[in-house]
Regions:
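Anion-recognition interface
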Residues: 1-302
Length: 302
């Protein structure tokens, strides 16, 4: 009997595919009619599931009980659903082997596919290799999905979200032309001086243009040898430099740092919103718990 497919969108952070889960959610009813389910009820739930899988709740200022059982809940709904499923969060890009094994093992009724969106090599590569080293991310996940044709790379163009959306449609099985992107997907953020100072102080540790070029070349070789499914041109992984062949001009470095700062501020704003949503949810649950406790006390006469 042929198993259903489970498509896991795992990043990369700032890889040009951050908008994909929101776009999928916006078209949830239409995708269900086409046989593609989304067992995560919300972005908040998938965020908590990802934090749980990564065992990283303390880093987010969360308690274990805030995230415990989130991934199990997603998997239970996946099991009860009909058709293929798609879920994901960019925090999963940096998952280690034990964490990936745990995630995949909870989906025994599915052929698990991993979808990775990546654009030009990111200068934060040397700061956060687990998140931004595309070759390592692909190899880690490929080891657990058992077949290279279940590893899908979407080479993204930061200026063309529609092309990335269409590439995802080809992979998971929907016609992106019939499901246009909502107009309000782009993330905006106010300036956060603390975040700017933090990353600016690390600017000397950011990868150079030449390091990024070498990384992109190595990734292209790894991808070709791995036999992965590629949507797009691998040349799109190379860093863009507005100064042609100059050997790492000062302006190019400044452009890389500026872009990294802007994207990190946007990401910080998004994560703060997710954290705030978690706090509101936790407060509501605590209020409900106190109310039920009072009712129980009244009923028992305690």
């Amino acid at each position: 009997m042929t198993k259903r497919a489970a498509y896991l969108i795992v990043g990369l952070p700032h890889g040009g595919g951050t908008f994909l889960p929101a776009a999928l959610h916006a078209h949830g009813p239409s995708l269900e009619e086409a046989g593609l389910r989304q067992p995560a009820r919300s972005a908040d739930e998938m965020f908590r599931a990802s934090v749980e899988i990564r065992r990283d709740h303390q880093s987010w200022g969360l308690r274990r009980r805030d995230v415990e059982g989130a991934w199990s809940g997603v998997c239970r709904r996946a099991d009860r659903s009909k058709g293929d499923i798609v879920v994901g969060h960019e925090l999963l890009a940096a998952a280690g082997d034990p964490e990936i094994a745990l995630l995949v093992d909870r989906l025994p009724g599915f052929d698990v596919h991993v979808v990775v969106a990546a654009g030009p090599a990111d200068p934060r590569l040397t700061l956060f290799p687990d998140d931004y080293d595309l070759g390592a991310v692909l190899d880690r996940w490929a080891a657990h999905v058992r077949s290279p044709d279940r590893v899908h790379l979407l080479v993204t163009d930061p200026g063309d979200l529609t092309a990335t959306w269409a590439a995802l449609g080809r992979v998971v099985g929907f016609d992106a032309g019939l499901l246009p992107l909502p107009a309000d997907l782009e993330v905006t953020a106010d300036q956060d001086l603390g975040a700017l100072r933090l990353l600016a102080s690390s600017a000397g540790l950011l990868a150079t243009v030449e390091e990024l070029r070498r990384a992109a070349e190595e990734w292209a070789k790894t991808i070709a040898e791995g036999g992965y499914d590629v949507q797009g041109d691998l040349g799109g992984l190379a860093p863009s430099s507005p100064h042609g062949d100059d050997d790492e001009p000062v302006q190019a470095r400044l452009d890389l740092v500026s872009g990294a700062l802007a994207e990190t501020v946007a990401e910080l704003a998004r994560l703060r919103r997710e954290h705030a949503q978690l706090q509101v949810r936790a407060a509501k649950l605590q209020k409900k718990r106190r109310r039920l406790k009072r009712r129980l006390a009244d009923a028992t006469g305690d």
